[in-house]
């Protein structure tokens, strides 16, 4: 039998057309029409149902970060600036593929590698490289096989694996999240059904770190709470604790028997040094604490679309690390089966090849340096233009690709509606999407929005 269609015949859903059992039942008049149509070898049947089974599903709100880019693309103004999404751009505001990434991809082509499935835990060479990059190759935790590393779908997917582990094996545990934090953190823990609350972090009065509030809230949390920490370049504020403050944070977490859960999305990209940006994580591991760490290579290698990252669990014994790894694999299997290979090979080749590794560090320093230059230029432009006496030095004290401007929602809306500057509504701007040439324009927009919009 074949499926034949008659464009002219459309069967509308009404009281004469009934669905019953496995067949459609027609009135006598409709049956004759149907028979005539069938005899002409051209049948078209479209059952238009008035009410969808999905009618009760509400429309989801646009993503607060990715939605910024959608609005930016719809704007036809020549002056428009996209400072919403954290993706590195050149001085010409073009996407940048690292030269070292191109070299690694050429090596892969020369080897003629296949596209077979990876193991559930990912590419072994990547997992080894990423743990060593995070902790240092000579770290006792690695040598003692106390690190369970599973390749995840970039930072988001790796955090999600960690959240699922908490939900499954730490019933009743809560996660403490900084106020503010990256927009997706709360979604991830909500989706994993892990309860969370916030600890104080940003002080709007000083546009700096509320360190006393942070310590008080971590102390007040029930024993055994998971504390989500940004390893470096805090998103969205760009405000990091000092080394001395990290020591105090570690003291309190250790005293309260909490479990630190680090999100390391910018290793090497914040300061330009891979080791400096991993110092906070290494401090906690050196203290003998058991630690969870999610990693991402979206920013520091520009592998945004490759979705390459890892979840690392540093345990107190090799036996517990092995059990944790087995359960992370068990969680990953029904979620996505196994991770993508392309980005994993890029990372493994670059970290494992001394020449490529050195080249990567040079490129990373270049990218971090460009952002530092833009940060300085923006501060200089605002300081020279604004005669109000306001102290804008917080811009220089922040680190990484973001600056937390202190602008409220109305002021951020003015930035977009009047100045065509697209940013998140919490006042965060991505300096990675700014050029030196655009700093004067952005300074005018910030000054106008800050002083003339409440």
Curated annotation (Swiss-Prot):
It comes from the Eukaryota. GO terms for biological process: 2-oxoglutarate metabolic process; aspartate metabolic process; biosynthetic process; glutamate metabolic process. Keywords: Aminotransferase, Mitochondrion, Pyridoxal phosphate, Transferase, Transit peptide. Residues 1-49 form a transit peptide. One of its GO terms (cellular component) is mitochondrion. The keyword Transit peptide applies. The modification N6-(pyridoxal phosphate)lysine is found at residue 299. Its cofactor is pyridoxal 5'-phosphate. Its EC number is 2.6.1.1. L-aspartate binds at residues 86, 182, 235, 428. It is found in: Mitochondrion matrix. The keyword Transferase applies. Gene3D superfamilies: Aspartate Aminotransferase, domain 1 (3.90.1150.10), Type I PLP-dependent aspartate aminotransferase-like (Major domain) (3.40.640.10). Its main location: mitochondrion. It catalyses: L-aspartate + 2-oxoglutarate = oxaloacetate + L-glutamate. Important for the metabolism of amino acids and Krebs-cycle related organic acids. In plants, it is involved in nitrogen metabolism and in aspects of carbon and energy metabolism. Homodimer. In eukaryotes there are cytoplasmic, mitochondrial and chloroplastic isozymes. This is Aspartate aminotransferase P2, mitochondrial. It comes from Lupinus angustifolius.
